[in-house]
Amino acid sequence: HWMVRRQRQMCIRDSDSTPFYGESGGQVGDKGKLSAKGLEIEVLDTQKIGNFHLHISKIKKGSINLNDRVKAEINTERRRAIVSNHSATHLMHSALRNILGEHVQQKGSLVNEEKLRFDFSHKQKLSESEIARIEQEVNQAITSAEDTQIIETSIEESQKLGAIAFFGEKYGDQVRVLKIAGDYSTELCGGTHVKNSSEIKSFKIISETSISSGVRRIEAISGDLAIKDKADNKTDLLN
């Protein structure tokens, strides 16, 4: 269904069947375009409300009516960067638990095309050595080049698989288990992810701070941005 607000400026599309990912689970919504003969619509954001997706859009050319058919195209380059950062978040979560201890629990996250942000329970500042070990573990998992496995199962079966569930999250009878880099990371997640861990390419932590008592925040980058950052820093060290 289409709802049009301020003709040629804004339209919102409700749909439970769309290639656009609606913002949820810390992952930002997709951008892209919708088109038809004589019609161009820029999708500025996608939000998820219940089973519906709201496509917040700007009509650039033409007009749209109820039941018009359109071609939907997401911004694939942007999605690719988001997917890389989301999968890297899962790998980093596993590395944090392996290196710092199982007391580490996710307290919040944000995944967009530029970086990942992950808040977690831990009482003290991470040392340079711990940060280096986390980066090393994540990059080793990336180079394992394992295919991502998606398992639709019951919450009980997911627990038997060792999947990490998040306190306070509401789960239905059926859940989606994501296994990234083999058995290295197993979590419940409804987001979009790489098909193979090698697609992440590289991982680099760019900051680690305290945001409240007992909660730390890591910001990191992956993919080509991480490769460029490492190359730039290597050049700096040589000069």
Where are these regions (language model features)?
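A structural micro-motif recognizing beta-strand termini
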Residues: 15-20, 57-62, 180-183
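Short helix/loop capping segments that flank catalytic or ligand/cofactor-binding pockets
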Residues: 21-24, 31, 82, 128-129, ...
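Conserved catalytic alpha/beta cores of large enzymes that bind or transform nucleotide phosphates
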Residues: 33-149, 224-228, 233-239
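Terminal appendage regions of diverse proteins
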Residues: 103, 197-239
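Divalent metal-coordination and catalytic microenvironments
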Residues: 25, 90, 118, 177, ...
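Non-catalytic interaction/regulatory segments
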Residues: 114, 120-211
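Single conserved hydrophobic/aromatic residue that forms the stacking wall/gate
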Residues: 1-12
